[in-house]
Amino acid sequence: MKAPLLSAVLALILGQAALPAAELATDFPKPPPPLELAPRMGRPFNDNAVFQQQMPIPVWGWTLAGAEVQVSLGQQQRTAKAGADGRFDVKFDALPADKLKSVDDAPVGRTLTVVTSFDGKRETKTFSSILIGEVWLCSGQSNMAVRYNSKGTNLDPKRPALRFLEDDWKVSAADTCGRCYGVSYVFGHKLQGELLVPVGLMNAAVAGTGIEGWWYVAPGDPPTPTKYQNYMPKIEPLVGHAMRGALWYQGEANVKQGKDYLPMLKKLIDGWRGAWKQGDFAFLIVQLSTIGESATDKPEGGDGRAAIRNAQMEALTAIPNTGMAVTIDIGEKREHPQNKYDVGLRLAAWALNKTYDKKDVVPSGPLYKAQMIEGGAIRVKFDHAQHGLMLAKKEGLAPPVPTPDAPMPWLSIQAKDGSWHWADGKIDGSDLIVSSKDVSEPVAVRYAYTIHPAGCNLYNKDGLPASPFSTCGY
């Protein structure tokens, strides 16, 4: 490989540049082995790290090829020998979580010590305050990467056992919490409060990125213009660090591919799960919210983000162990809605119910389940509406307030001849009955199936919004 091309590829690894398609003609190069004996650790390993409880704990790094390596974590010790590329790997036995007496508890943690030796020389690195708890990967594009803003949230930032990783692990405090992603911070804050164990958040998002750049890159895969751009610098350095699951807030860059997004999302999830070799770990998606101007003259909808929201909801049944936070009620005209607080809480609700088996937590708002034609009306049934449906209005970060006499916007019904008409909705316990004076033989229903359905007001009585839906697919 010519030197300029090698430099460009290495720049790509570091996230500094994207290669022109014409230059993507060779396999991804392996870095040369380290020239120093001092151990260089994988990205997840430094002071204040959080390791996943109840799973074997892999630790890896690089040193001189052939060097002897001793690694200890608390009372456990392992040995290894660096390979020809300088890499060494060890694995510790699974450990229980460090239980917290309260959310502001500050466990001492364990020490991770790495000793490398070669030709009579010896180097040691020590990392302190290593905690055992719950670890989540938080990825996507700019709406995931928006930093935490404490305004109006009333979240106490002093959480010594809540930590987040970018270049290194940081401990949650008043002067650090604003450097964490907003969605992931609220998610982790809520989890820790409910579980009373340490929580570690591995943040890895890049603004403006399509899903293709995040797909798993297998060793020896031929490069393409989309590969390596995000997966290699952001995800690959984390692969193997045991974790409970992943959060995914992305889709804005793929809205024109809404009808194809489900297989694209499946490729992402399957690739990451295969890389981690942990089975079907939890994968929680943020459904896209509103943006732009409302399109009130098209009852059939289908414009803008309608298809990709539909694909995100279909993932719940098409891909095992996936979840979704609905955000249709907290969007804005802008690309980046300010309210990341409710997004984090809704992701946490799904995780608490499904991943941590806390059945007293309602995981989601109403999700379309089935329709039944009843004369000139259609009865729509939902999952997660067992306590009933309601109409409500949400303002800012406050819980939605019931508005039982309000009209229900963004409902449309399809006639037997294929035409679409605006419709009325009537709540009947946990069902929604939809009809229109212009349609005597209805066949399908759509709700909020457009780019910016402002004022969506259908919730379950637990205060979580209904997802947009189409009973006839795309």
Language model feature labels by segment:
Residues 7-17:
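Bacterial N-terminal signal peptides
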